[in-house]
Amino acid sequence: MHLALFGATFDPPHNGHLALCLFARELLGIDKLIVSVSNNPFKPESGRADVHRMRMAELLTQEINLTGAFSEVSGWELEKKQPSYTVDLLRYLRTLYPADKLTLLVGEDSFREFSKWKESETFCSLSDVVVFRRVSTQSESTPRPEIIPCEACISFVNFACDISSTLVRSVVASGRSISTLVPPSVHRYIMEYGLYAGEEHHATSIPEPKPRES
């Protein structure tokens, strides 16, 4: 079985997360996707309560599974109640799935901090790493494979996405609609609980919808 791990704070999950998961499934032939809700050790402020982020991540996996994919949420990192590290989760998954192929899915923004990640030099012994690089980003902004300790297991994939959680929070706080930015179920949840309303965030403008290719 081919397992993939995709971790984020999911504050909140958005259509970029959904698109990345579905794209990775088709591209890599993933059998099972584990969506892990994390606390970023480089950003001590946890943001929304864990219960909200977990529930929104569950809604994200439901959206993924509606397409015929198989995904599930892991709250293992949150249960530790301390800064979480990817290497610890990978080791935990290895105890559960010792014989299966494991791939870590990483966004470009997160990968910029890769050299600071705990025990990054051990990743190749635990999993492959696929970095989803923004198409509009210049290549020199992403660390080059040769300066990464475990370069043999790292692959780069171009991925077009202009959405971020920061943008979603900013749009909600400004009173504008996020219906094009997040999955419908996540949208309803944010509105129901009044998340992000009246908060101050820094973000760019809402991306223009891209025309469909014929």
UniProtKB/Swiss-Prot annotation:
Q: What class of enzyme is it?
A: transferase
Matching entries from CDD domains are given as: NMNAT
Annotated GO molecular function terms are: ATP binding; nicotinate-nucleotide adenylyltransferase activity
Transmembrane region(s): none
Q: Which GO terms describe its biological process?
A: NAD biosynthetic process
Could you say which EC number(s) this protein's record lists?
A: 2.7.7.18
Q: Does the keyword Transferase apply?
A: yes
Q: For this protein, what reaction is catalysed?
A: nicotinate beta-D-ribonucleotide + ATP + H(+) = deamido-NAD(+) + diphosphate
Which keywords label this protein? Answer: ATP-binding, NAD, Nucleotide-binding, Nucleotidyltransferase, Pyridine nucleotide biosynthesis, Transferase
The pathway where this protein functions is:
Cofactor biosynthesis; NAD(+) biosynthesis; deamido-NAD(+) from nicotinate D-ribonucleotide: step 1/1
Query: Which family, according to the similarity comment?
Result: Belongs to the NadD family.
Outline what the protein does.
Catalyzes the reversible adenylation of nicotinate mononucleotide (NaMN) to nicotinic acid adenine dinucleotide (NaAD).
Query: Any idea what this protein is called?
Result: Probable nicotinate-nucleotide adenylyltransferase
- Taxon lineage: Bacteria, Pseudomonadati, Chlorobiota, Chlorobiia, Chlorobiales
**Gene that this sequence comes from:** nadD
